[in-house]
Amino acid sequence: MLGYLVWAQESKPKAGPESAGGAVGGSPPANPNPYEPSKDKDESVACRKNLQKINAAIQAYRKDHQDVPNWLSDLVPKYLADTNVLICPVTKRTGHQSPFGVLDPKVRSSYLYEFTTTPIPEIVKGTFPGSDMTMRDWKRQQMKLAGQQVPLVRCLLHEPALNLSIGGKVYESPVYWELNFTNEAGLSAFSPH
């Protein structure tokens, strides 16, 4: 059930000679893009500002369309003219994007948009098995448990992760934001059903 978190842990570089610029003998490292979230506070503050701007754009979109967009790219250019807002400072520094979820097919973005109308990706289904459904349907199901705290947009490039909730609040959480709510319901209650 914790396959997605295990993958993240296995992707972190190991201590020893292999991690110092490549494997022994000059071979390239096993994973050239390890999942290594940033703990830099300045990057986190700048990312929060991006998420607040994204929230303002989503709220304007919702006012016009009575629903959330299918993708963050649906906000461009009418609701979000500056696409640099979609790039986290960690991505600017490292070039890395989120290793999990579904990335926007139309614009480069560091952020995972949780309310797409695409099927739940396999990497997520490995952790949260259950019915086949879209990300949007699953997140709306989770809203019955966590209400307005369900993430609409996430940045997993930080430790702790940053979340923009459907209610417009930016908050920190572990990679599994659902762990913040397991007192009310067990983790399995958040699986698609």
Go through each PLM region and give its residues:
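Activation segment
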Residues: 84, 97, 172-174
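Short cysteine-rich clusters marking metal-coordination/redox-active sites
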Residues: 88
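Conserved hydrophobic/amphipathic alpha-helical signal-anchor segments
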Residues: 7-85, 170, 180-181, 185-191
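Active-site-flanking ligand-binding surface segments in enzyme catalytic domains
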Residues: 102-193
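Acidic glycine-/aspartate-rich tracts in secreted/extracellular proteins
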Residues: 91-94
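Hydrophobic membrane-insertion alpha-helices, especially the h-region
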Residues: 1-4
